[in-house]
Amino acid sequence: MEYRKRVDALVFFSLLLLGYFAAHAHGKGHVTDDVGVSTPAKEGIMQGNGARCVVGFPPCKDNKCYCCIGGRTHARYSTMAECRHACF
C-alpha cells in the first residue's frame, strides 16, 4: 500500500510539472517588452501569410463583427477595411 501511494504521488507531481511547463511554453508565443508592447520581430512574423480578417460569430458586440486572426491585434472592428488596416 505504501508503494502505491508513492507511485500516485510521483504521477501527480509529474503531471503537475508537465502542465506548468506546457503553460509556460504556450506563453512564450506572446513576446512583449517591459512596457507591454509587442516586439517588432514578433510582429513581423505574425504579419506573414497567416494573418487574416474574418467575420466573427453573431451576435456582434457593439456592431463590431470583424476580427483579426494571426495579425498584430486581436480586437474586433466594424468593417472589413478597418480590420485589414489594423491587422496587417
UniProtKB/Swiss-Prot annotation:
State whether keyword Signal applies: yes
State the signal peptide span: 1-27
Q: List the disulfide bonds.
A: C65-C87
Q: Which UniProt keywords apply?
A: Developmental protein, Disulfide bond, Signal
Tagged with keyword Oxidoreductase: no
Identify the Pfam families for this entry: Meg
Show the InterPro entries listed in the entry: Meg
Where is it expressed, tissue-wise? Expressed exclusively in endosperm.
> What is the similarity comment for this entry?
Belongs to the MEG family.
> What is the protein named?
Protein MATERNALLY EXPRESSED GENE 2
Native organism:
Zea mays (Maize)
